[in-house]
């Protein structure tokens, strides 16, 4: 996959099993966002060869690929600035015909106090949590999350991780890109590294082992 005639990544195969969370780890500029955008099905031009399917359904042939939702790393730039957080959530719930319990979701993420504020008045961290709530509110079985913990303090990171963990417990599949290796190691069942333009699956490890493997892979073992 890549841009135009330029190939950026060769991914081989990537499988998300029901009720599992996988982490995507690589330095900036290595193609993580390109990969996640391609996997989302929203950018078919990113895929130069091969195929992409959710529950056996090819995204090029069926609207049922809406079973997958992608949360970008835009930091809230893709939210409508004049609409409130609750208006965003209501729109998502209606668009996906979701039965998600919005009140319970917002309480669990701690965003209830500012639901009525227009998103332009929210901090980066608040916007990030609203976006995560929107992704979960779709009730899609596949969540692709690009840096969902960016801009969050430790307490908010915990509530966000707990929310993602709850989705996994419900049988949903989550793919998470993050540089926060401690959180990622605690949250996920497996990891994928991007090494020299190739996606490589890693065995589940502790956060210390993950950090060391990251250093060995990208920093020459420093």
Mark where each language-model region is.
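Q-loop/switch helix immediately C-terminal to the Walker
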Residues: 71, 81-95
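Conserved ABC transporter NBD signature motif
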Residues: 41, 45-65
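Conserved ABC ATPase "signature" region
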Residues: 90, 99-115
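Hydrophobic anchor residue at the start of the ABC signature
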Residues: 132
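Catalytic Walker B motif of ABC-type/P-loop ATPase nucleotide-binding domains
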Residues: 143-147
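The feature captures the beta-strand-to-loop junction immediately N-terminal to the Walker
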Residues: 25-27
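H-loop/switch region of ABC-family ATPase nucleotide-binding domains
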Residues: 177-179
């Amino acid at each position: 996959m890549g841009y135009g005639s330029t190939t950026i990544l060769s991914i081989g195969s990537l499988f998300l099993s029901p009720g599992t969370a996988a982490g995507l780890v690589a330095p900036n500029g290595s193609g993580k966002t390109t990969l996640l955008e391609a996997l989302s099905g929203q950018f078919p031009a990113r895929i130069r060869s091969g195929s992409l399917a959710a529950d056996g359904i090819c995204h090029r042939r069926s609207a049922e690929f809406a079973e997958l939702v992608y949360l970008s790393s835009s930091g809230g730039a893709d939210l409508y600035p004049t609409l409130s957080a609750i208006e965003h959530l209501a729109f998502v719930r209606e668009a996906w015909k979701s039965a998600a319990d919005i009140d319970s979701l917002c309480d669990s993420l701690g965003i209830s106090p500012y639901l009525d504020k227009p998103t332009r008045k929210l901090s980066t961290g608040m916007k990030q949590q609203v976006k995560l709530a929107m992704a979960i509110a779709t009730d899609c079985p596949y969540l692709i999350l690009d840096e969902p913990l960016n801009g969050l303090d430790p307490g908010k990171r915990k509530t966000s991780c707990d929310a993602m963990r709850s989705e996994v417990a419900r049988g949903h599949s989550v793919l998470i890109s993050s540089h926060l290796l401690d959180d990622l190691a605690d949250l996920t069942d497996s990891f994928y590294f991007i090494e020299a333009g190739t996606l490589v699956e890693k065995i589940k490890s502790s956060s210390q082992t993950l950090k060391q493997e990251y250093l060995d892979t990208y920093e020459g073992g420093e």
